Amino acid sequence: MNVSEVKSGATRSPKFVQLIFVDINGMPKGMEIPASRLQEAIEDGISFDGSSVPGFQGIEDSDLIFKADPDTYVEVPWDNVARVYGYIYKDGKPYGADPRGVLKRVIEKLAEMGIKAYIGPEPEFYLFKKNGSWELEIPDVGGYFDILTLDKAKDIKREIAEYMPSFGLVPEVLHHEVGKAQHEIDFRYDEALKTADNIISFKYIVKAVAEVHGLYATFMPKPIYGMPGNGMHLHISLWKEGENIFKGEEGLSETALHFIGGLLKHAKALTAITNPTVNSYKRLVPGYEAPVYISWGYKNRSALIRVPAFWGNGARIEYRCPDPSANPYFAFAAILMAGLDGIKHKVEPFAYVEENVYEMDEGKRKELGIDTLPGSLGEALDELEKDKVVREALGEAYKNFIEYKRKEWESYLEYLEAKHLPKDTKRVTEWELERYFFI
């Protein structure tokens, strides 16, 4: 594909292009090139030093190449610059630790089976005033679905939604969330790789618009103790030959039920990837509609997996534990491979619940076979190390991921010890704010 084809739908002629990829944490990284080098970036790639990118290479062997994916070209409406995602190469071959490449390989496995995965995310975020400290100021007092005077950020949300189509995102619903200054803008589902790209773009738009209004936007899972956390529920369906194969005659198909079985089977290990930060586990506590118990049910928001009340081609499942700190490429790859394992081995879903699982006593949960998700990043990493299917979903990136996250956990424990804080504290620490606030 040449540059003229890439820009066929463009309305302006930016002088620079941002080459965007993500590190092991899902944080966007990149570089700018003159627009005149875009064709080179597509065909030959642009070299860069991978040693300073978290979770990539050491300084002794750090040369990497970024090749632009021309299908992702967009122009930033408020700046004289375009953006493009791409893939990382090393020594002429796809780089194993490239998160986007990890998801691409999983999608190719699905394609061999004639399957496409569609995912719709619900990323939540807070808007805070800037005050030069970690004493976070809340700019509004609205609550869930509040409108008009109580939602002080309604104009900001509208502005975000107006910019989204320029990046290929279709906004669907804008609303205030449960927490004061907490918000959600849902955008239309798409194929898994496009949705992962869209999540990165969405965060970029939200933060840029907030900045203009003198605010900080954070997707940190639990920025304030005692307030609801930020989740990122994922709506998932699989399609084959234009048909939703999660669709059954009455409700879900056997394929969908086995996919649920796979997610339940691998849920503990998956959590290390869908909830990959110390702070993630301060959201996953009872009382805030964040799932804690490994269970599933129809229309039941207390379960880990909810089946929404949509049938026919709208049939899907909602995986409720992920949060916006997840690297979406890793998270989607792991979830899809866990679900496929369930389909392959015909894993029947277990721990079905119709009532509020939080209100059950321990005996009832035990009777229904309901287990709990890991209670900390350390516990989640232990589960990941034991789960071959989820490990292999990350491919060569697994080694980098587990090493990086083990160091992160150890650093947090050292901080707690130095501050004489209990290991199981659910308070949000300054260590977390410094590390995760700008996720």
From Swiss-Prot:
It is found in: Cytoplasm. Residues 12-93 form the GS beta-grasp domain. It comes from the Archaea. Pfam families: Gln-synt_C, Gln-synt_N. Keywords: ATP-binding, Cytoplasm, Ligase, Magnesium, Metal-binding, Nucleotide-binding. GO terms for molecular function: ATP binding; glutamine synthetase activity; metal ion binding. Transmembrane segments: none annotated. Mg(2+) 1 binds at E122, H233, E318. One of its GO terms (cellular component) is cytoplasm. Oligomer of 12 subunits arranged in the form of two hexagons. PANTHER family: GAMMA-GLUTAMYLPUTRESCINE SYNTHETASE, TYPE-1 GLUTAMINE SYNTHETASE 2. Probably involved in nitrogen metabolism via ammonium assimilation. Catalyzes the ATP-dependent biosynthesis of glutamine from glutamate and ammonia. Belongs to the glutamine synthetase family. This is Glutamine synthetase. The lineage of its organism: Archaea, Methanobacteriati, Methanobacteriota, Thermococci, Thermococcales.
